[in-house]
Amino acid sequence: MKRFVVLQLAAFLVVAGGLSGMLFATDVYQDVQETIVKVLCLSCLKLEPTTEVDFTFTTANQESHPSFILENLTTGPIFLHYSEDVCHGCDIMYPVIKTLFSIEFGKQDSVYEVIPFEDAMISYFYINIDHTTAELRDTLYIYDKDHVQGLPMFTVITLGYDKGVVKPYYTSIYGTLNKDNDQERLAFLTTLLQESIDIYEQNREGYTSG
């Protein structure tokens, strides 16, 4: 009888331990899964969102523009380039952006540079979300205009006039821009930057970063 009770107790402990392990493993799995799917690699999933260049004053999550954005807008338009380590679309766009701005950097670098572009100065930020600060990473959710939650993503911020106030005016585009080759992608981005410069010049006199 005592042996039977001992065996029952041992069996209970094994089952209880197994259930605890399952619960712990499930929590860990959910945490990992949430981290992985938080930002998708668009090309990995064979997704290519339609790229529409429509500027807006409203941030994607209703948060205020970060102070470093407001400050850099005193110099010229801003180009935010979001990437991650494992992302085929990011790899496609990486050399396109380097050609666009005549700049060299590593894929895991953090880059901030004010770059001459035609008759303007562009504040360029390269943000690899796997190797950046929380402040820069969080801007992805501020400017994910179409709520795609995918990479690569490119945000151009200029100045617009809204109800008597000059303030940040931005658009975000995604993936490989629905273009077939690098030449088309480069032409598309060049035109977008030219448009952002024109809008900026129309409104810069009325802007204050404070």
Tell what function each PLM region has.
Residues 84-89, 129-134, 160-163, 176-179:
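Solvent-exposed loop/turn segments at secondary-structure junctions
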